[in-house]
Amino acid sequence: MRRGKPAALAAGAAAAGVLLPVLTELRLRRTARPLTDRWRCEAVEPRGRTPLGVSFRPLQAAALGLEPGAALDALLAYPFQLIRLSAYWDQIEPAPGAFAPGELDRQLDAAERAGKQVIMCVGPVKAFGYPEYFVPAHQLDGPLREGALVTPGEHPRLLDAALSQVTRLVERYRGRAAITAWQVEHEAVDPLGMEHSWRLSEAFAAAEVAAVRAADPGRPVLMNGFLATSTPVALQQWWRTRDQGDSLAVAQRLADIVGIDFYPRHALASAGPLTLYLDGSRKRWQQRRRERLLDRAAAAGPGPRGPGAAGRRVLIAEGQAEPWETVTVPPSLAGRAMSSCRPEDVIANYSQCLSWGRAQGLVLDGYLFWGAEYWLARERRGDPSYLRAFARVLECA
């Protein structure tokens, strides 16, 4: 009994050590708050040599009631430098033997006419933008088993089809000078949110990276991963990927450019007018992994940037610039801003990330704002503040 008491005390102290950070990261807020003009005076971090841009999600544009082509044209009119486009496998191959890249061709043509540099996500299994999973049904014998690790040995047919798809895409577009990098998969080895628990193995992703490099040895490969900004998410992410590491860890091993997906505040649950949010992004204990990642890139210096320089380059692949609430399509209420991302947060999140590079002597390879389609939908409903916050960054940075 005496030996049990210290053990119980130690267990209690350990539990408190986890619980205390969690409690400091919880925020109970009104879900929708009155719009203000704070974005007009939010400090804008100089970008230096870091190119700025957006990711374009045609499916999200349509979900918000926008015509995707017109939405892309509206965004391309802004004076940013970089845009990320994506090949959605099930749209490009809607039936066995089909190859229909026409829509992606049009997007790339429009970006080139606007003088933008392009990061092309070739997927193929996962790509950015909900639902993030785009394998044609005819390429699978059945649904991927929940909880499974998708390996080359257990899924040779899927891997062969994936390699064929990425090779065909890279060979089609490698002559386009606007393309600066190929993105392979999206958060490659993480589970697919809360909807699916299967994961791609590192070996599966490595084979795809090798295929892209074989088809175009001269361009870098980008892989992205979610940077946990709260203790509960960090613990869950570690537990679910503990066998091979999460997507950021795998990106550091396989890719030339590591893309960070940064979402400092997101909703957990709502009740009436209130929502409980997680926000631990500025807590000291949440800075350590990001610092290690940037330190590694900064220590590597400005030397060769080929496949032998994994982890040398870092880019903010997704900087939160739209709300992350408890629904898939962010709400848009007249005269209100959702607490997870207000117009001023578009600027504050950007400035926070750019300050990381400055503090660690590193020039980020880019900062891509996430949520551009939402800004357009807000403007159409009479609220241009998100777009104006973005424009202010472009003007002042």
Residue ranges and their predicted role:
Residues 119, 123, 311-397:
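Substrate-binding cleft of secreted/luminal carbohydrate-active enzymes
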Residues 130, 150-158, 162-198, 365-369:
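Active-site groove signature of glycoside hydrolases
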Residues 97-102, 126-151, 198-199, 236-238, ...:
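Aromatic- and acidic-residue-enriched segments that line the glycan-binding/catalytic groove
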Residues 3-82, 210-213:
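N-terminal carbohydrate-binding accessory modules
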Residues 41-43, 68-141, 194-224, 274-284, ...:
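Aromatic-lined substrate-binding rim segments of carbohydrate-active enzymes
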Residues 50-56, 81-85, 118-122, 180-184, ...:
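Hydrophobic faces of well-ordered beta-strands that scaffold small-molecule active sites
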Residues 202-203, 207-210, 214-225, 229-329:
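Glycoside hydrolase catalytic-domain groove-lining segments
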Residues 61-77, 162-172, 233-251, 343-354:
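Short, acidic/polar
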